[in-house]
């Protein structure tokens, strides 16, 4: 542990268009090689596609998608008496959103649509409708935690 205490988390400014910190964090997750302009263009184009396809506010669709993606439980490896147990633990709120954004971006990149903004828009719309690869990842995480519920008493 550090002797001088912990550093404060850097405050993330909300994005200029939707005034949302979550959107700003998504832009940061999308960004490759420091190209924030490219990442924000991709995101705003994806939001335009969502507005065209659904007719709803893209921020509301995105927030619904994030609600469907963010995990409540996960498993963490714990070594007890020479064997490793997968111990289910609750996920902290900040980690919930971090995992949700990470899964959303990763599974968007794996999709087969032509452009990244199209992939991201489709993944967000799928997640808002409780389908898609990122929602499946959340379900798999919850299943793993449920399967290892017997080891919950090893929680620390």
UniProtKB/Swiss-Prot annotation:
GO CC, any one term: small ribosomal subunit
Molecular functions per Gene Ontology: rRNA binding; structural constituent of ribosome; tRNA binding
CDD domains in alphabetical order: uS7_Bacteria (cd14869)
Ranges annotated as spanning the membrane: none
Keywords, comma-separated and alphabetical: Ribonucleoprotein, Ribosomal protein, RNA-binding, rRNA-binding, tRNA-binding
GO biological process assignments: translation
SUPFAM superfamilies according to UniProt: Ribosomal protein S7
Pfam families: Ribosomal_S7
Gene3D superfamilies membership: Ribosomal protein S7 domain
Keyword Ion transport applies: no
Described purpose of this protein according to its UniProt entry: One of the primary rRNA binding proteins, it binds directly to 16S rRNA where it nucleates assembly of the head domain of the 30S subunit. Is located at the subunit interface close to the decoding center, probably blocks exit of the E-site tRNA.
Similarity comment: family membership: Belongs to the universal ribosomal protein uS7 family.
Subunit structure: Part of the 30S ribosomal subunit. Contacts proteins S9 and S11.
Descriptive protein name: Small ribosomal subunit protein uS7
Source organism (scientific name): Leuconostoc mesenteroides subsp. mesenteroides (strain ATCC 8293 / DSM 20343 / BCRC 11652 / CCM 1803 / JCM 6124 / NCDO 523 / NBRC 100496 / NCIMB 8023 / NCTC 12954 / NRRL B-1118 / 37Y)
């Amino acid at each position: 542990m550090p002797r001088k205490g912990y550093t404060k988390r850097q405050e993330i400014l909300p994005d200029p268009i939707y005034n949302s910190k979550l959107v700003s964090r998504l832009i940061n997750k999308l960004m490759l090689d420091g190209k924030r302009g490219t990442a924000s263009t991709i995101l705003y184009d994806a939001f335009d596609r969502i507005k065209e396809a659904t007719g709803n506010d893209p921020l509301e669709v995105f927030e619904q998608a994030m609600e469907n993606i963010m995990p409540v439980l996960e498993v963490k490896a714990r070594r007890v008496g020479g064997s490793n147990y997968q111990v289910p633990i609750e996920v902290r709120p900040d980690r919930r959103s971090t995992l949700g954004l990470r899964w959303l971006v990763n599974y968007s990149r794996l999709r087969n649509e032509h452009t990244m903004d199209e992939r991201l828009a489709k993944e967000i719309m799928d997640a808002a409708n409780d389908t898609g690869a990122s929602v499946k990842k959340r379900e798999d995480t919850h299943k793993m935690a449920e399967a290892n519920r017997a080891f919950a008493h090893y929680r620390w």
